[in-house]
Amino acid sequence: MGKASRNKNKPDAVKVTKVANPDQGRSWFLPVMVAVTLIGAGAVGLLAVNRDSNSGERPLTSDHWHAAYGINVCGEWQDPILDTADPEGIHTHSDGVIHIHPFRTTAAGQNATVDAFFRATGSVLNDFGYQPGPNIPAADVLAADGCGGEPAVWQIAYWDNAIIAEGGAEPDQIITENLADFRFEGDIAAITFALLPVGEDVPPPPTIPQLSQLTDI
């Protein structure tokens, strides 16, 4: 007879399966997901802030430009804007100078516009008129009002170099349409916002000397 196996009558081993507590996995899952979400949101925000640096459109958030400005209504210079609100980085210090150092992409690159400057104080300047913000003690001035009974238009005179402008140079640009969209193009510039008859010479702003008095550059 053949030799019987020793294990023939040995009972099969019982396989024990450990049932995991469903709450154990969840204890770390939620914090990890929250952390991942926060990190992702931070990265997206950082990319948004620095997007203009990658595009190369100036001014960048690292730029710090200045432009002397003045508002001329029918030959009369208006007081400099005193409201120093600065929600996006294009503002004034009540000194007759536009400080252009955007810290948001909404005011950098192609967005560094005349509209960005005026909206910082709740003001509006466009082809139809100038509406000062609530903290500026001045009245609205519409193009339709004209100058002394003569038709007039709101316009922008822009000098690339304020020093040359002060010496009597002609403006590099005269803009009579889409004023709000005009973009600041460089440092130490001069810009006059004027309501004057078409063809009348637009003078440079009287605040150009302030550019040599700046302390925040």
List each language-model region with its residue ranges.
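Ubiquitin-like/PB1-type beta-grasp interaction modules and other compact soluble beta-rich domains
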Residues: 2-217
